[in-house]
Amino acid sequence: MRIRSNVLLLSTAGALALVWFAVVFSWDDKSIFGIPTPGHAVASAYDSSVTLGTFNDMEVDSYVTNIYDNAPVLGCYDLSYHGLLKVSPKHEILCDMKFIRARVLETEAYAALKDLEHKKLTEEEKIEKHWFTFYGSSVFLPDHDVHYLVRRVVFSGEGKANRPITSILVAQIYDKNWNELNGHFLNVLNPNTGKLQHHAFPQVLPIAVNWDRNSKYRGQEDPRVVLRRGRFGPDPLVMFNTLTQNNKLRRLFTISPFDQYKTVMYRTNAFKMQTTEKNWVPFFLKDDQESVHFVYSFNPLRVLNCSLDNGACDVLFELPHDFGMSSELRGATPMLNLPQAIPMADDKEIWVSFPRTRISDCGCSETMYRPMLMLFVREGTNFFAELLSSSIDFGLEVIPYTGDGLPCSSGQSVLIPNSIDNWEVTGSNGEDILSLTFSEADKSTSVVHIRGLYKYLSELDGYGGPEAEDEHNFQRILSDLHFDGKKTIENFKKVQSCALDAAKAYCKEYGVTRGEEDRLKNKEKERKIEEKRKKEEERKKKEEEKKKKEEEEKKKKEEEEEEEKRLKELKKKLKELQEELEKQKDEVKDTKAK
């Protein structure tokens, strides 16, 4: 019996070994047992079944870093580049909050949230009062023909989305037309072990959180999904920020849903980290998928190299504050390489990203957030922005943050890019489409499709004056290593200054074209009315105080007069008593004398 068991064990082990070797040796960078691996997708996100809508023209003004040592001092006009993109109508990415709520309440960590809902409300009313969602980030998984999206779901006991008890990250999948696939599952290979796993959606990401009914702003915020090329398949990493266990520090984390939900916290000893860490911009080097890189900050421009195993980060590149990008740049989408392999200089890479600007006291509102286009370049261990555009709004009337529903009716105008979902060349003619997810007014998650971005970049040109050795075009950007230290940095600083000046001009124009002048007139009219009202209130207050004072003085005088009268009466009576006593004394004397 023991011999038969040993034989059985040996046979099983041999079979497993054969399977393992078959997996390893059948992997040819294109598939494993017919399951395609990243970079060799058999599916397009934009096949004939996909409806993208009618594309409209979108003019984009950009500014290009100039690299010529002998070029004159250049103005923004010399560095400008004007081109045309095509953009689709926006498509709001909806979700079934009833289904999501049920999944969340099934989770042990969040089951007690049900006790904080208003008991007398119906299920629909509970969802409307307590549950909110915004800020979704996604990537297209060509191996599975779906969009993988992670959104922030907010629970508020008091019914205010901006005062949540906790936030929860929920992963969803959508078909190519952005229809949510509820109750569906994916069979995925663990990107590191090759083991088959089953994932049901929507899926509450299992991230430890410490909350109670009296807590505020707990849980995970600002999800960013970036696709890593794992050994056995795609590895969508979800980056987010949350409070640490002591609830005093907010740090950046990554969870890998396809790799047994492995979670790491990023940290560094190279400089003092802030109390709140957020807005790191992730990207991968094409030849290094085992670590993740971040643009930690734009001012100073600081690039980190971080371990995906333990979260330890080192500074790879840093510019001093004087040469950093503007502090008005606040984060960006995860950066993506160009959509097709093209000849490029050795030790050089290029990424596209959409940073966002935060401009205060401009045009339509007190604060305006808008995307801009950025071409980010690595040459060896040097990093810089080759191109920055002005503000981009995709031709949208941005949802007002608050107010009466008009574009200029609230204190904030918020359009924030979340992620580049996909970018691919769709045909033999070289036409390309990029899908970008974004949020408006912290209320919604939508997607737009941009056609012709690769063409826009490929036709790029810059300063071509007589001092230039040759034209500063896209081919030169790709083929040459032209980072030359201070000169490039100074030009790069000029470029971002031009782009931000253009963004401020856009902001002002946005207000003018959307009734900002009338709004300001009405605001001034309201200010004068309010000022008049306050003056009238002040006048009435002074009159009332004067009247009160006069009444008090009159009353005091009357009381003093009354007191004086009373004293006189008392003195009179006292005198009369004294006279009476004297009279009585005299009478006593007379009686004794007799």
From Swiss-Prot:
EC number(s) from the headed UniProt entry: 2.4.1.-
Gene name as annotated: BMT3
Q: How does the protein associate with the membrane?
A: Single-pass type II membrane protein
Which organism is the protein's source? Answer: Komagataella phaffii (strain GS115 / ATCC 20864)
**Stretch list, region Disordered:** 517-564
Example GO molecular function: mannosyltransferase activity
What protein am I looking at? Beta-mannosyltransferase 3
Effect of deleting the gene: Decreases alpha-mannosidase resistant glycans.
Question: Which family, according to UniProt?
Answer: Belongs to the BMT family.
Provide Cytoplasmic-side residue ranges.
Answer: 1-6
What keywords are assigned to this protein? Cell wall biogenesis/degradation, Coiled coil, Glycoprotein, Glycosyltransferase, Membrane, Signal-anchor, Transferase, Transmembrane, Transmembrane helix
Q: What is the lineage of its organism?
A: Eukaryota, Fungi, Dikarya, Ascomycota, Saccharomycotina
- Which residues are noted as glycosylation sites? 305
